[in-house]
Amino acid sequence: LXRKNVD
């Protein structure tokens, strides 16, 4: 997505 590493 746009945060950490969640795509």
Swiss-Prot record:
UniProt record similarity statement: Belongs to the tyrosinase family. Hemocyanin subfamily.
Subcellular location: Secreted, Extracellular space
Function: Hemocyanins are copper-containing oxygen carriers occurring freely dissolved in the hemolymph of many mollusks and arthropods.
Tissue specificity annotation: Hemolymph.
This protein's UniProt keywords: Copper, Metal-binding, Oxygen transport, Secreted, Thioether bond, Transport
The organism's place on the tree of life at top rank: Eukaryota
Protein name: Hemocyanin subunit B
GO MF term (any one): oxygen carrier activity
PTM description: Forms a thioether bond between 2 amino acids.
Species whose genome carries this gene: Concholepas concholepas (Barnacle rock-shell)
Assembly behavior: Heterodidecamer composed of A and B subunits, each containing 8 globular oxygen-binding functional units. Heterogenous decameric or multidecameric structures may also be formed.
Annotated GO CC locations: extracellular region
Cofactor field: Cu(2+)
Keyword Cell membrane: no
Cofactor: how and how many bound: Binds 2 copper ions per heterodimer.
